[in-house]
């Protein structure tokens, strides 16, 4: 209701242009989808095992992030001019897409960490119980997103990659005076 009532009001008052109306209709459809996904997620926990599926949890979080990001993107495009110098450099645009994709992946794996309670198994940092690779049967379960050990390992290391790429992006922007 917080979205739909003002949206309908602005449409009837002809405050929004057609391009923005179409984009906001797309976002409203995502909001409806989010409700269905929320029920789909909760339903997975209404069994003998009272925990929700980490896959469904991550899907619910991802759709929420897409909705939020879309609204932020629309508002920034409305209030600020695009940095044409940054986006005219093809490599910087590709780099930014990679960084944003990694952030989305990190969100998904973070939901896996939450859904699997993977954060409870290795509570030491920066190493995992004194080793870079977890000591349990980790290598046999590589890319097994049902294995809490692998999920925590992936979540930690993607965070390192995002950090270093973000620092590099900051230096790139500073160096090129963007």
Question: What is each stretch, according to the model?
Answer:
Residues 1-178:
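Polytopic transmembrane helical bundles with strong interfacial aromatic enrichment
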């Amino acid at each position: 209701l917080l979205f739909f009532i003002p949206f309908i009001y602005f449409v009837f008052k002809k405050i929004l242009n057609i391009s923005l109306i179409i984009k906001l209709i797309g976002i409203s459809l995502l909001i409806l989808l989010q409700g269905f996904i929320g029920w789909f997620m909760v339903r997975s926990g209404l069994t003998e095992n009272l925990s929700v599926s980490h896959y469904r949890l991550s899907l619910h979080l991802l759709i929420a992030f897409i909705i939020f990001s879309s609204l932020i993107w629309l508002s920034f495009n409305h209030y600020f001019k695009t940095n044409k110098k940054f986006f005219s450099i093809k490599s910087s645009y590709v780099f930014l897409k990679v960084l944003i994709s990694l952030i989305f992946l990190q969100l998904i794996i973070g939901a896996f960490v939450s859904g699997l309670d993977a954060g409870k198994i290795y509570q030491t940092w920066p190493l995992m119980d004194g080793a870079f690779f977890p000591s349990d049967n980790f290598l046999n379960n590589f890319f097994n997103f049902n294995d809490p050990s692998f999920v925590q390992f992936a979540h930690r290391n993607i965070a390192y990659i995002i950090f270093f790429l973000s620092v590099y992006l900051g230096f790139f922007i500073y160096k090129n005076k963007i």
